[in-house]
Amino acid sequence: MANKLKITLTKSTIGALPKHKLTVSALGLGKLHSTNEVPDNVAIRGMLKQVKHLVMVEEI
């Protein structure tokens, strides 16, 4: 596994489930096309699995 993941919000959270909105916020993403680097661990991978239809993930 990589040390960090680069996450980009590619779809809007308008109309998404409230728990998905909270997950996107917890990942450090706000506006559309915002990007954040997070550590690669099991907790983050679980969060990404929940919102995989809204984000793009790159290993760095």
Swiss-Prot record:
- What's any GO biological process attached to this entry? translation
- List UniProt keywords, sorted A-Z: Ribonucleoprotein, Ribosomal protein
GO cellular component labels: cytosolic large ribosomal subunit
Q: Which domain of life is it from?
A: Bacteria
GO terms of molecular function: structural constituent of ribosome
Task: Note the PANTHER family from the entry.
Answer: LARGE RIBOSOMAL SUBUNIT PROTEIN UL30M, MITOCHONDRIAL RIBOSOMAL PROTEIN L30
Q: Which family does it belong to?
A: Belongs to the universal ribosomal protein uL30 family.
Assembly description: Part of the 50S ribosomal subunit.
Record's protein name? Large ribosomal subunit protein uL30
Question: What organism is listed for this UniProt entry?
Answer: Lachnoclostridium phytofermentans (strain ATCC 700394 / DSM 18823 / ISDg)
